[in-house]
Amino acid sequence: MKKKIVSALLCVAMAASLVVGCGSKSGSDSGSSKGGDKLVYWAMWSEDEPQAKVIKEAISKYEKDTGVKVDVQFKGRTGQREGLEPALSAKQQIDLFDEDVNRVNGSWGKYLLDLEDMAKDYESEHGNETLFKIALNAYGQTHDGDDTLHSIPYQPSIFGFFYNKTLFTKAGIESVPTTWEELDAACAKLKEAGITPITADDAYLTSFIGYHLARYIGQDGVKALVTGEECNGESVTWDDEKVKAAAESFADFAKKGYFSKNIATNKYPAGQNQEFAPGDAAIVICGSWLPNEAKDSVAEDLEWGYFNYPSVPDGKDDNTANNIANQVLAINKDSKMADEAFQLIEYITTGEYDKKMTEDALCIPTDKANSDAWPTELAGVKEAFDATTTFYDWAAGVESNNDITPVLQENTQKLASGKLDAAGFIKVMKEAAGQ
């Protein structure tokens, strides 16, 4: 597909050079560009991030191959999240943009071009079935079940527990925990060996408690719990026995001293970079972007391991339900350069530059043709990723009510540090929810 488009664009460019002075249409339904136009791409990365550096290399090759100039603007997370929608609403030229799959397909969904036909060849040749399913679902959730494709996945990730295999071996732990009881036993061995079992950063505490609650009551139950509204037939309150059980099992780990003594004060990225990466803590809850973020702090003897959040007794979901997500690239429905934008998507997300992204940014490959290109640091993630059959939203939906999310984060930190027991946690959350 890429070769066909490149050839077509080169032919158009040659023909244009022979008919200087002849009249031409100002635009076309196909979205092809006029001579001298630039493709404008707003990127979520900061310019010094490895992802941005690979993208710049892909753009350079794209410009050389096609003659199409690209104005790439690296906005960073804050710049993208605060500036993109106002710019799109004001009809500013932005042909291509990216961000996380739910934000693009949900919050910015009305600006997206339908890619169903344009991406058919791409999907069959390069598309990861799981990632495309997530992208389709993300759009459908906020558009009355419309499951047409409006974005192309890249930079996939999974959220769960990373662990230090070296420390597990030192503590005599022979198998990866798959249940809460097995995690309890592993933490006991780590503590006995003088090793901090689990650490976490403030940025991921809502994800921590969200996952934990979802194991007991499922994601719809979590959403119903925090919003106070029924979700897909589920209605759950903070008095629910399974919610109490979740709080009690979490508090039990705090009482046993399994959580880092710094968990009450850890500000991202202190837990991952100052405790886990140097080898002071054996387990950290984080996403698969961790090896890239922590690479400058990693102990020489750290051997990377990963396991999905464990199953709990009588829980609704087991450890095959996980938050697998990705960034996505999307084309502005008003773009006059849709074909060129899609071709740039191909350059970034497939073949050489997708593989380079796995090497430089230590991320999961996007192109199914690169399925053997997982970084060594993420080798243990692949089995857990492939075993996932139920796909959680970010934090298993526990951040669905902005009014109580700050209260939840603060009191999860208190619960994990032992400053609050299970009953106290439930009481505070009931009050925050107005129950």
Predicted regions and their residues:
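Extracytoplasmic/periplasmic substrate-recognition and gating elements
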Residues: 60, 65, 69, 89-90, ...
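Conserved N-terminal structural module of periplasmic/extracytoplasmic solute-binding proteins
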Residues: 4-8, 20-111, 120-129, 175, ...
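Short, solvent-exposed loop/beta-turn-alpha elements that line the ligand-binding surface or hinge
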Residues: 116-134, 218-245, 296-299, 311-320, ...
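Extracytoplasmic/periplasmic solute-binding protein
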Residues: 144-154, 159, 184-235
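Short helix-initiation/N-cap motifs at beta->coil->alpha
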Residues: 74-83, 180-184, 263-277
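Glycine-centered hinge/linker elements that transmit conformational signals in sensory
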Residues: 187-189, 231-264
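Hinge/lid segment of periplasmic solute-binding proteins
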Residues: 101-159, 184
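C-terminal capping/gating helix-and-loop segments adjacent to ligand/active sites or protein-protein/ligand interfaces
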Residues: 144, 322-323, 359-371, 376, ...
